[in-house]
Amino acid sequence: MMAKTIKVTQVRSSIARLPKHKATLRGLGLRRINHTIELIDTPAIRGMINQVSYMVKVEE
């Protein structure tokens, strides 16, 4: 059985953001605006997304 995945897209810049939030974006694998990645839907990933929710768009 395949694990459920989610698509995460960075929609706002990381310039002038908290260092912790920049690090969270890097941890998610996002590098630039409109960069989209597909991640496995886990509680840890969801927590990271919640922390930077104002900078990313999530598609189920």
From Swiss-Prot:
The keyword Hydrolase does not apply. It comes from the Bacteria. One of its GO terms (biological process) is translation. GO terms for cellular component: cytosolic large ribosomal subunit. Keywords: Ribonucleoprotein, Ribosomal protein. InterPro entries: Ribo_uL30_ferredoxin-like_sf (IPR036919), Ribosomal_uL30_bac-type (IPR005996), Ribosomal_uL30_CS (IPR018038), Ribosomal_uL30_ferredoxin-like (IPR016082). Transmembrane segments: none annotated. GO terms for molecular function: structural constituent of ribosome. SUPFAM superfamilies: Ribosomal protein L30p/L7e (SSF55129). Pfam families: Ribosomal_L30. Coiled coil: none annotated. HAMAP family: Ribosomal_uL30_B. Part of the 50S ribosomal subunit. Belongs to the universal ribosomal protein uL30 family. This is Large ribosomal subunit protein uL30. It comes from Histophilus somni (strain 2336). The gene is rpmD.
